[in-house]
Amino acid sequence: MVLSKVACFITFSSLAAAGTLYSANFASDFGPFSTCNVKAPSSATVESGELKFFFDETNFDGTRDDKGVEICVFESGTRTNVKQMAKEGWQGFNIYVPSDTFPTDKHTIFSQQFCPGGCSSWCGTLEIAGNSVVAEHRAACGDPTSATIVQSISRNVWHKVVVRMKVSQSGAGAYEVWWDGSLVYSKKNIDVGFGDWSSDTLSSGWYFKNGQYAYGMCLCKVSAGLEDH
């Protein structure tokens, strides 16, 4: 693992997560989202309708909170994530990746679907790998199904992203991604998700996260953001 300083800008806009619908246009604040898994000087800031993420890896301490900066929806008065869905959910946002402050040779997750239950808990992710976008999903604590869904990201422009995940342990699940209005990945009639099941529904729930999870460390600066269009 190479440790360094990472400053990246990714920009998101019109962020919505449903089950229960949570959305924000970032006109003045994060609401109803909160920053999570972040340690200063890394930060998320709202500027002119954009949510900008800045990740600085200097003096990395090995903790999860020092691997990026993300946003979550918490239960009132707690730091516990709201379990937004039990079966099917949709996650939509716009993302902007700049050419001057985001690297082309690193790995950064920017969209996550979490199924609380150990082993890092994620059951689906979208990540920037080099200059490609990779989708991953899994039905247990093990190796995921992985596919490159965008070969080369066009930088300095906004991209519209929609993720649909339907959990199942009986072959009735789905994982789909739309990029700029086109369906670029679709897997149906699959197993996806894990946790406590009841009639093929996750009684333990699942939820979304957005931001930067720079699990692949680098010697660079990276920045990112979200905006309402």
Task: Provide a role label for each language-model segment.
Residues K5-L15:
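Sec-dependent N-terminal signal peptides
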Residues V2-S4, A17-H159, M165-H229:
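Low-complexity, Ser/Thr/Pro/Gly-rich disordered linker/stalk regions
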